[in-house]
Amino acid sequence: MGKIRKLDDQLSNLIAAGEVVERPASVVKELVENSIDANSTSIEIHLEEAGLSKIRIIDNGDGIAEEDCIVAFERHATSKIKDENDLFRIRTLGFRGEALPSIASVSELELITSTGDAPGTHLIIKGGDIIKQEKTASRKGTDITVQNLFFNTPARLKYMKTIHTELGNITDIVYRIAMSHPEVSLKLFHNEKKLLHTSGNGDVRQVLASIYSIQVAKKLVPIEAESLDFTIKGYVTLPEVTRASRNYMSTIVNGRYVRNFVLMKAIQQGYHTLLPVGRYPIGFLSIEMDPMLVDVNVHPAKLEVRFSKEQELLKLIEETLQAAFKKIQLIPDAGVTTKKKEKDESVQEQFQFEHAKPKEPSMPEIVLPTGMDEKQEEPLAVKQPTQLWQPPKQEWQPPQSLVREEQSWQPSTKPIIEEPIQEEKSWDSNEEGFELEELEEEVREIKEIEMNGNDLPPLYPIGQMHGTYIFAQNDKGLYMIDQHAAQERINYEYFRDKVGRVAQEVQELLVPYRIDLSLTEFLRVEEQLEELKKVGLFLEQFGHQSFIVRSHPTWFPKGQETEIIDEMMEQVVKLKKVDIKKLREEAAIMMSCKASIKANQYLTNDQIFALLEELRTTTNPYTCPHGRPILVHHSTYELEKMFKRVM
């Protein structure tokens, strides 16, 4: 007798449930998506004990006809596709016909539904077995209740997390759906307490305000672009509003929320040097395309997709974001306090430099006043950064925290915890007392971010503090400038161009510099010798596991040549495959930091003025290459308010 047998339907559904129904959030996702596919304009979600005890979804959609009710709970039964061609033209959120039978097989399920033109149907299913079916009076739409989830699979139940965690997973899913479909009114309740209410008026910014707070909504930059194959719309926050997790970026493809790392990476690339390392924006991006260009039949939960023209899409996203930021003055408002935000965030976190050849740039430098001693340098094709004069030490000594730029800037080591989004501020919570109408009014009153160019306004220096910060003013108020970050940006744009166009101008080292490597590192570097010449690293093999450097580009920061070579080699060794574009970027950032003014370095008025004028000529005068702000702004009104001149 053969050993292979066909499994019965109930066991097959239990196995399928293991893929489709991982936790209560999976149930909520599948049922709410079914409601949206049924043309619902209003959906209510009621939870008890984070859905482990009870999940109830009520919608005003098309409903299910009586003759379809039983069929709907059979495996691979669906109204959304008919043949294999439909699989490549999917516009609905569901299409496999697996969700309902999988959910019913591991729960006690009750369904009341009506199409509106006939009596409704009442259906009770327990563990996949139909217990009751009868006609009933019902309004148009569907009311489905799932109780005692995983009652017959105790092993699965044992691996559920705390109620708080499971509720977080559900709110995360509901928030993404709300952003994906702002035309649908969504209400989310937990133990009879309202957690979310969206109006369904189609305004995604209002949904974002409901989820992230009105303060975040005020910092949103609209994004919109179109190509032959793609249309993208959405909002991203100004660079000053960041989080420690990518989880606050939502990508929507043809109305479906998807998790796609390359799309998130494209959003990050759109910010290029505007964000600190390890920080991420809040963003929502909706992408419309021909269904033939995207494969959604990849993941059981339909969260992962594959694109046919991925590189074209990524380029469109990057260029659209970069173009948007070039129209905005990205000076953060110093009047905004961030202490509370950081505290809130710790809770929520559960939850190519190939330019066309321009004219040869001159090395940015700070002009020394006449009469100052200046060290004579050997004549070079490109002049190195001038050493800034520093006065004798004063009695006052700066706090140790100010002397911080001697090393390359490093991001905070605060651990990043990837968890679902949690609300920053619930506009519909009972204790807050906010109503949906009030939120709508708040959103309507938000002023659009001005997009009339990102040129730095003229600044008139008035002093320096602690040898680190420059104070300047204009008719709009007071500006505080980090002098190290400012010159770092100037130097970065200079070195970025130089590293991208390695010239024949090299300088011989008096003593060749030897680099010893392990065998693995040596072999990895040996493969990339020709590529490394493109970034100014000229290596000659010396022995079995060593290289020597006899010369370097003239634009290497003077006195730091060997240090630059060492750090560039470290970058090469760390990368399994050398990405020249990335290596050029890292090299430019590293050299710009080392060649810039340090903290506790006093400048004359002429030097300060020259620094600010040089900063104004950069393409991005608002952040250093590491993404830290260069300057912050106190408006005249804020200052008057601080001194009680206005109330």
Curated annotation (Swiss-Prot):
GO molecular function: ATP binding; ATP hydrolysis activity; ATP-dependent DNA damage sensor activity; mismatched DNA binding
Entries under InterPro entries matching the protein: DNA_mismatch_repair_CS, DNA_mismatch_repair_MutL, DNA_mismatch_S5_2-like, HATPase_C_sf, MutL/Mlh/PMS, MutL/Mlh/Pms-like, MutL_C, MutL_C_dimsub
Pfam families assigned: DNA_mis_repair, HATPase_c_3, MutL_C
Domain of life of the organism encoding this protein: Bacteria
Keyword Lyase: no
Keywords on record: DNA damage, DNA repair
Gene Ontology annotations for the cellular component aspect, listed alphabetically: mismatch repair complex
One example of a Gene Ontology biological process annotation: mismatch repair
Coiled coil: none
CDD domains per the UniProt record, alphabetical: HATPase_MutL-MLH-PMS-like, MutL_Trans
UniProt keyword annotation of Repeat present: no
Similarity annotation: Belongs to the DNA mismatch repair MutL/HexB family.
Known role: This protein is involved in the repair of mismatches in DNA. It is required for dam-dependent methyl-directed DNA mismatch repair. May act as a 'molecular matchmaker', a protein that promotes the formation of a stable complex between two or more DNA-binding proteins in an ATP-dependent manner without itself being part of a final effector complex.
Protein name: DNA mismatch repair protein MutL
Species of origin: Bacillus thuringiensis (strain Al Hakam)
Originating gene: mutL
